[in-house]
Amino acid sequence: MTMQRLCATLFRAIPALTLVLAAGAASADPIYWTDWIGADTDPGPGFIGHGNITTPTATVNVTYTNAAGIGFYQSSGGIDYWTPRTPGTNSPYTSAQVDNPPTGTDIIALRYAGDQTLTFSQSIVNPVFAFVSLNGNGYAFLNQDFEILSFGAGLGAAAPGNHSCGYWGCGTVSKQVVDLGGGNIEYRLIGTGEPHGAIRFTGTFDSLTWRSMTSEYWNGFTVGVQNTANEANPPTGVPLPATWLLMVAGGAGLLASRRGRKTSL
């Protein structure tokens, strides 16, 4: 194959390769959910739970603290409150951004109004927060906006609620934005009925704090991530696939130009 034919072949391949790369970037990624460990037999005041998130290249230690206490802590076996799981596209926890519902049966069930915090041993990116049975309750996040990805209001409901109902039934959620003054804004996730679903926070996090707005036994949650901060923003030095594509195209163009100048002499 001559150099000119090689260059022409590469240029013809660029549109197809670009579409492949774009499709890959637009698709949902698997979520790596927290594996809650241990069995704290005292869910009362001062509760602390521990877990791990294992991604392809890292293990993130997760610590959950709640001064008021919780309803119960399920870290091994027990009822699977994250059903229905099949088909996956109908799950109240999956969406265009989330491929898979929470893994296993692990869940932290909440009971009391008040603040609680998740702390991560290394920075994570765009955490996904899955919730069960947020009926007659709400979660309030101070100065931390979120996106409602999905919830189970029934397959015929409007998006993003067009998913199967959860373990305890159907429901809806909405976001309320409340200006508290002094530069503080509270973003509230409000449930009606028996909502089960998932929300996502955008950005890099070492911790996440929220407030249960009312006491109610019980509503539950877990948390997962697509990437750690290091995975989402790898050290420079290794070109990404799109970068390689541009390098090949540029090199081919340069060679073609030089070849053309040679033959014209």
PLM regions and their residue ranges:
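C-terminal membrane-anchoring or membrane-association module
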Residues: 255-265
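N-terminal targeting leaders for non-cytosolic proteins
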Residues: 29-112, 147-186
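Extended extracellular/luminal ectodomain segments enriched in beta-structured repeat modules
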Residues: 121-128
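A short, hydrophobic C-terminal helix/tail in secreted or cell-surface proteins
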Residues: 239-257
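N-terminal secretory signal peptides that target proteins for export/translocation
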Residues: 1-9, 263-265
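Terminal, low-complexity interaction segments
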Residues: 152-235
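Short beta-strands within extracellular/lumenal beta-sheet-rich domains
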Residues: 104-121, 136-142, 195-197
